[in-house]
Amino acid sequence: LIIIEAMIPFFVSFEGRKPKVRDIVILAVMCALGGTGRAAFFMLPNFSPTMAIVIISGVAFGCEGGFVVGAMSMFVSNFLMGQGPWTPWQMFAMGLVGFMAGLFFSKSGVRTKNTTKLGLCIFGALICILIYGGIMNPASVIIWQPAVNRSMIIASYVTGFPFDVVHGTATVIFLWLLARPFLEKLDRVRIKYGVL
């Protein structure tokens, strides 16, 4: 319940911007890409383009847009992967990834020229392991254990680290391949149609 309540300010902030239909449509497309990207790679645990798409969305559309794409991508993809008590945690963690991408990289009108592929890849790997893994690893203990202690939390970080590395590697690969073409197209759409 606390995680769900923690997401409310982000969604209220987005709604406070009074988004137009065209803003919502482009964010919905990015959410659909994130959700289907996760479903398309379901046979490879933790290897999907979802985090890369969320980071790209945060860079292209700012903090609030990145949060919305991250949170909704996890919500939508969990209709295929399975909804459960982990869904709000995943939504919050991935939304935070999109928010932080917007915070670190969206400083100018044309964001493509100021964002390097290498910088995005390093950011993607670190945020995947430190933020997403840092939230989801202990969440696996908090969700299922009635009495949580420090050794359980440490064990969740240790056992989750290899999966975080795989997830971070996938994020780096997909950012390396997709960041530049996606950001160029999204900047073009943003400038031409006045999106976000």
Name what the model sees in each region.
Residues 7-14, 53-58, 132-137:
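Short, mixed-charge, low-aromatic patches
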Residues 10-12, 80, 173:
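Residue-level signal for alpha-helical transmembrane segments in multi-pass membrane proteins
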Residues 21-27, 64-66, 182:
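Membrane-interfacial loop-to-transmembrane alpha-helix junctions, especially the N-terminal start
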Residues 30-105:
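Alpha-helical membrane segments and adjacent membrane-interface helices in multi-pass membrane proteins
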